[in-house]
A protein has these predicted regions:
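A short beta-strand submotif of the Rossmann-like class I SAM-dependent methyltransferase core
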Residues: 9-10
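Class I S-adenosyl-L-methionine
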Residues: 3-6, 15-146
């Protein structure tokens, strides 16, 4: 732990990154900057980080082989409660040149998930679909204002 100031964990899923950090509690002491690049489950990773003693210092987006990935920079510290939009689309990405693309990507996924829920017979499916559509519309509105 004392041999590095910056630690990069990249190229794996958010769940795997969470597992690594759960087994390295010293990363929360505030003396290490973590560069995290989840290939999947970025929202789950953001949620876990925010409730487990990490604060977001910056975020950036990168295109790689046709995919858009977030790079999260965090360190130990308290984090305010994140909104669903922040969990999904990032905490510090508003100035990123690829942010509009990221919003469009997530809005499309939300619309697709909502359409699937509308086919469901589950009792809460319609309510959940409406919430996802509302979030998708919020993302599209923000993208339009960029």
């Amino acid at each position: 732990p004392d041999e590095a100031d910056v630690i990069a964990i990249a190229g794996m899923g958010g769940e795997t990154i969470i597992h690594i950090l759960e087994n390295a509690p010293w990363t929360k002491d505030g003396s290490h900057q973590l560069l995290l690049q989840p290939m999947t489950k970025a929202a789950d990773l953001r949620r876990w980080l925010s409730v487990n003693g990490y604060t977001f210092t910056s975020e950036r987006l990168v295109w790689d082989k046709g995919y858009l990935y977030p790079v999260l920079c965090v360190k130990g510290g308290s984090c305010p409660t994140l909104t669903e939009k922040q969990l999904l689309c990032g905490v510090k990405l508003a100035d990123d040149p690829l942010y509009g693309d990221y919003l469009a990507l997530h809005a499309g996924k939300l619309h697709k998930t909502a359409a699937g829920l509308r086919q469901s017979r589950r009792e809460d499916a319609a309510q959940r679909a409406a919430a996802l559509e509302a979030l998708a519309e919020e993302l599209e509105k923000e993208r339009g204002s960029l």
